[in-house]
Amino acid sequence: MHSIRVSRSVCIHDAMRLSRYQRAPELGPRMLFFSGGTALNAVSRVLKNFTHNSTHMVTPFDSGGSSAKLREAFAMPSIGDLRSRLIALADETVTGHPEIYNLFTYRFPKRARKGDLLNQLESMIRGSHPLLDPVSNPMRRIIRNQLGYFYDAMPAKFDLRGANIGNLILTGGYLNNHQHLDPIIFLFEKLVGVQGTVRAVTNDNLHLAAELEDGSHIIGQHLLTGKEVAPLTSPIKRLSLSKQLGKFTPAKSQLRKKNQKLIQEAELICYPPGSFYSSLLANLLPQGVGSAIAANEGPKVFIPNLGHDPEQIGMSLNHSLQRLMEYLRADVADNCPDEKLLNFVLLDSKNGSYSSPLSNNLVRELNIQVIDTPLISERSALYYDSEKLVSALLSLT
């Protein structure tokens, strides 16, 4: 088959294009997002109304919260952010499975006795827990089996307080599939009717490590985000991967061919807002990500953060853009044109609070275009309006 490249003019916030996508979201564009955490979940809930073909590359490096307990107990990648994105993309219409959605979002009480929590888990495995009552077979049987696999492998001292049932189901499936995430994620997608594709950028059990400008080193995503511990006091100089959490052990990860194919075949690639280092740049660390992006002929869009990101101490918008390009270029040849990696910066300078204006000289140097358009509404206040953001991105496809 002979392929040609076609360029065209587009209208941002193209109502006709959006209407067409909304009528047949199953035929919607293949859009790919590099993200992690929960920052993109609201956008995902809007996006699924227009396309069921979005792909979400999610970081599996979270080292805090309930994910930390699972990672320590089973030496596995983090699954909390994967589960969160799967739920955000789940079918919420009457044709979906709200009873499974409710089960997968349920958390055990944080203040409960160990015996009571074990009884709850055992009742789910038996199928006698109230949350299992509305779930019919074969889904009921599948869920019980995955929880059973988790239960059988669970260390005697494992703390179930605050545990998310969806995470336990995913963990059981991971353990039952020879420590592979893809099979259980695929099953999860079918169980909750996920309207898109969610994949971990790597299946490797690794941790984020950062060298700070003051010369100190920290290991663990939870130490970067400023959510579970005090925010950083020195800017991040370099982000890398470590095999161990307690001691820096340099590690490399290779992008799998399945993920490479998803990146190369996307009609649009988005570097969205969220934790700049631990969500966005962390996705670019596996070898092969940058080259897969460069091989994609579609538009690549960067949406900078609004307000204050604890990971971006002292970073101007120019610095953020340069740092993004630095991590993208780390995986490609020196002669790779910048436009193979990034084409657009999407922002709202009138209503948005950015760290600084974007330099026209830098824009020209990188040969990119700035799309300055309304992305913030009164209801979204200090944040991007998810509907406006989705509208702008869909207009570029």
Positions of PLM-derived features:
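Electropositive, gly/pro-rich neighborhoods at or near active sites that engage anionic ligands
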Residues: 61-237
